[in-house]
Amino acid sequence: MTEIQAEATNTHLLKHRFRGYFPVIIDVETAGFNAKTDALLELAAITVKMNEDGLLVPDQTCHFHIEPFAGANINPESLQFNGIDIHNPLRGAVSETVAITELFKMVRKAQKAADCQRSIIVAHNAAFDQSFLMAAAERTGVKRNPFHPFGMFDTATLSGFMFGQTVLVKACQAAQIAFDGKQAHSALYDTERTAELFCYMVNHLKHLGGFPHQQANEKK
């Protein structure tokens, strides 16, 4: 086997695990459900890497409290739910432009280091998080968006398939990942737990022999 062939079959390389996609775990906290009109208030992201044993582990983190964009709708019920005080100066909130620029910069650098072709959002009920991230990217006009425009890995779906649980706290409990309900609905905390959950599911499938996939006749 040549060196090129060996690399092409090396499942310890992240670029070979998801067909060249680079997973980035995301969570957002918002002032409503409409990504076009409601404020994005908090954003966290965690990249992943393969360790020397070929197991997926969390890597780099970025986290921002975000100022509502001009004219944004603020739903009081949403603020009551996530506990965010948008007028608290200790939030250290930045503009959407700063947050999206720094996020894209971190992701592009990590994606390049992993030799992947495109990044893909991983989130719990991912369509929600993706819609707010993409809306913010469009509003700010930040260029070189590394994320696939519509593809995503939804850990609610994946954990439903693997554990029969779709709620984040229940899925974490099934995976024996500690979850503090008092810290839930912090974008950073939820991203950290979602990253652990995603890595656990990917690694557990590998331990069970489900990846790399082999057809029945290939095992003979």
UniProtKB/Swiss-Prot annotation:
Mg(2+) 2 binds at residues 27, 29, 185, 190. Trims short 3' overhangs of a variety of RNA species, leaving a one or two nucleotide 3' overhang. Responsible for the end-turnover of tRNA: specifically removes the terminal AMP residue from uncharged tRNA (tRNA-C-C-A). Also appears to be involved in tRNA biosynthesis. The lineage of its organism: Bacteria, Pseudomonadati, Pseudomonadota, Gammaproteobacteria, Pasteurellales. SUPFAM superfamilies: Ribonuclease H-like. This is Ribonuclease T. Belongs to the RNase T family. The gene is rnt. One of its GO terms (molecular function) is magnesium ion binding. Mg(2+) 1 binds at residue 27. GO terms for cellular component: cytosol. InterPro entries: Exonuclease_RNaseT/DNA_pol3, RNase_T, RNaseH-like_sf, RNaseH_sf. Homodimer. Residues 24-198 form the Exonuclease domain.
